[in-house]
Amino acid sequence: TLLIECTLMEGTNARRGEMEPVSRHLANYMIDKDMNSYCTFISNNLHSTVISDFRMRLNFPWYRSDTEGIDGMRILPLHTTELKTVLEKNIKYSQLYSLFMKACDSDIKVPPQWYDECIKNEINNV
């Protein structure tokens, strides 16, 4: 299941205002409905720290209570420019899913480089 979270906050405000709710929404959905769910976080301003924080969620546990938690979650940041490209190119969900899962599996550690190579360039090259 794909969850979509959007914000109009900018810069580190997006990090402070969205990091916890986006993670909580996805984690709760995973625990309650579908452990294979993932999320795209759409913003008109993706600060490197926001990209980094969501990228790190892949490998860090999250706990709803002392007895309920998950080992990690897939939250993929997406700039509105790339969303526009997805819509203009009429990129199908199956293509997007494949692209997103490939991005999750990437070994690139530097957040802006990871985003540019695994999300932005891949969407532009579909």
Label the model's feature ranges.
Residues T1-I123:
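Catalytic core segments in nucleotide and nucleic-acid processing enzymes
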